[in-house]
Amino acid sequence: LNNSKITKLDDLKGKKLALQLDSSAEKALNAKADFKASLGKVLTTSTNLDALNELKMGSVDAVLMDEIVAQYNITKQGGNYKVLEEALAEEEYAVGFLKGNTELRDKVQAQIDAMAKDGTLSKISKEWFGKDVTVSNS
C-alpha cells in the first residue's frame, strides 16, 4: 500500500507476502532461494486479485506479481497501492505465430513498429498500465 514503509526488496525480510499460485511471480521467488528464505511467510492465492485483497485486508505485508499485471490492476481497479522500482526478476513478452507464417509475423511487426514510432503504443500503455511500459526493439 502507498503508506507502507516497504520501499525495496530488502524491506520484505521477515514480512508476509502473497502471490498467485503457479504464476511467474512464484517461479521468480522460487529461483531466489535466499530471498525466499528471508521472508516471514508466503501465502499463495488462486488469483492476483485475491492476493491484492489479502493486502487490502491487512493479512499480508506485500504482494509479489508481474509488474504489468500490478500496473493494470492499480490503474483499472483503483486502490492505494505502490509498485517497487526494484524487480525480483525481469520478464519480457512476445507474440507467437505458427511456425513458418512469416507473412503474418512481418505484418504484425510492421504495425507494432508504426505504432511505436507514432506514439500509439506509449499512449495505450499509459491508459492501461498507468505508465509507459513499452520496450524499444532497437
Question: Where do the model's predicted regions map?
Answer:
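Flexible hinge/capping segments at coil-to-helix
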Residues: 1-17
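Hydrophobic residues within well-ordered alpha-helices
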Residues: 12, 55-56, 95, 108
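Ligand-binding clefts/hinges and TM-proximal coupling segments of bilobed small-molecule sensing domains
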Residues: 24-43, 82-84, 113-138
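A ligand-binding cleft/hinge motif common to bilobed small-molecule-binding domains
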Residues: 28-33, 54-57, 61-90, 128
